[in-house]
Curated annotation (Swiss-Prot):
Residues that coordinate or bind ATP: 14-16, 22-23, 159-161, 199, 206-210
Family: Belongs to the class-I aminoacyl-tRNA synthetase family.
Residues holding L-tryptophan: 147
Protein name listed in UniProt: Tryptophan--tRNA ligase
Length: 434
């Protein structure tokens, strides 16, 4: 997975509900096909904190998170090539949310579509504007902005109904950058896929849980067959020509078959293929693609501990690489700093000029690359462990120089630090020296 030099693409995954074929064709399959594209670093997170706005059943929350993680892994998302993590495993997200809350305008949040929709519904029913509205629903756009800005995502694939949230994230980022005088955040862009496929449901309308017309992605082969055979069709009998265009059976077939197969299927319908036989062909075509995914899904569901370990490992590495260093910079920017350092700078004491600390990068006989922080008298304050390349060491040095808390000095890549206060003071001098 790349770092800094790639375009960062971040995708949030809802962790409530059971995935259906419409989710698979319209969101899961295209997202996985796009994952790991050259020059792209892909981030996928399970939005379990967001789910708490609507779901307050602990068992359901836990189960849904497992099912959704297993679904994406079964469908081919490779955690060796992309970042897959659970939102609640990255506490810096909620800390950043608070920092953004302190610069977000309430007027902007008042205009959020989800919030306004509930207010309008309450008014139409003659109720209080805020009846049934939690602070979580109202603050949802700020949490979404924190999801995006913590990893400085360049692009966020969303539907048109979500563009407003990306615009809000840009607004919060610009406000923070302006108030605190730095380029702390990249301004994200909404990536709109105009070709998003929508599948018809069992009744011919768009497949949607709200219509109750969905086909679960991982139902059994027998259940899938029953769903397919319950698709509503017209009354034309076998032998009568049938229009492929507008037919739910044909539209579903198109989502799982190639151009040539679809052409042959349309021709067969025009020549009088019966709906019963057409549904048999549709069922076999869908099952041919879904069956191996179903098998992988069932395997993952039998190994929840493996999924847990993978999610925790991914979140831990992302926190160390991106989240903790950025929050250290933001804490420094807003003034959440060590008071001991504040006292040192607030009460200047005349003293002899002392040489600046220095960071030295070098190569050892083992072929690995190291760095150390040395104070003005030549004493080693911090010693790194070995890196595979000078580029890796250099990137880590850049992050290390921004450390403003003792927690940031605790890392597998650093030898234990004896005196964090002295080290933080030395790093502060380096930053002030420019």
């Amino acid at each position: 997975m790349g770092h800094f030099m790639s375009i960062r693409v971040l995708t949030g995954i809802t962790t409530s509900g059971t995935p259906h074929l419409g989710n698979y064709v319209g969101a899961i399959r295209p997202a996985i096909r796009a994952a790991g594209a050259p020059g792209t670093e892909s981030f996928y997170f399970l939005a379990d904190l967001h789910s708490l706005i609507k779901v307050q059943d602990p068992e359901r929350t836990q189960r849904s998170t497992l099912e959704i993680a297993a679904t994406w892994l079964a469908c081919g998302l490779d955690p060796e090539k992309v970042w897959l993590y659970r939102q609640s495993d990255v506490p810096e997200i909620t800390e950043l949310m608070w920092l953004l809350t302190c610069v977000a305008g309430k007027g902007i949040l008042n205009r959020a579509h989800a919030y306004k929709a509930v207010v309008d519904k309450n008014r139409s029913e003659g109720g209080d504007d805020d009846a049934g509205i939690t602070a979580g629903l109202f603050m949802y756009p700020v949490l979404m902005a924190a999801d995006i800005l913590l990893f400085n995502a360049h692009q966020v694939p969303v539907g048109r109904d979500q563009i407003q949230h990306i615009e809000m994230a840009r607004d919060f980022a610009q406000r923070f950058n302006h108030i605190y005088g730095g380029e702390y955040f990249v301004l994200p862009e909404a990536a709109i896929d105009e070709q998003v496929a929508t599948l018809p449901g069992l009744d011919g309308r768009k497949m949607s849980k709200s219509y109750g017309n969905t086909m679960p992605l991982f139902c059994t082969r027998e259940e899938l067959k029953k769903y397919v055979f319950s698709i509503v069709t017209d009354s034309r009998a076998p032998g009568e020509p049938k229009e492929a265009v507008g037919s739910a059976v044909f539209q579903l077939y198109q989502a799982f078959a190639g151009v040539e197969e679809c052409s042959m299927f349309a021709q067969a319908l025009a020549e009088g293929l019966g709906w019963g036989e057409a549904k048999v062909r549709l069922f076999e075509r869908i099952d041919a693609e879904v069956a191996p995914l179903r098998e992988r899904y069932e395997d993952f569901m039998r190994r929840p501990a493996d999924i847990e370990a993978m999610l925790c490992d991914s979140a831990g590495r992302l926190r160390e690489r991106d989240a903790i260093p950025l929050l250290a910079r933001l804490r420094e920017a807003v003034g959440l700093r060590s008071l001991s350092l504040c006292m040192a700078s607030a009460v200047p004491v005349p003293q002899e000029k002392v040489a600046l600390p220095v960071l030295k990068q070098y190569r050892e006989q083992d072929g690995r690359f190291y760095f150390k922080l040395i104070d003005g008298q030549g004493a080693v304050l911090v010693q790194s462990r070995g890196f595979a390349s000078p580029r890796d060491a250099g990137q880590w040095i850049a992050l290390f120089k921004q450390a403003v808390s003792a927690e940031a000095l605790v890392s597998p890549m650093l030898e234990p630090v004896a005196d964090p206060v002295v080290v933080l003071a030395a790093l502060r001098r380096l930053r002030e020296a420019g």
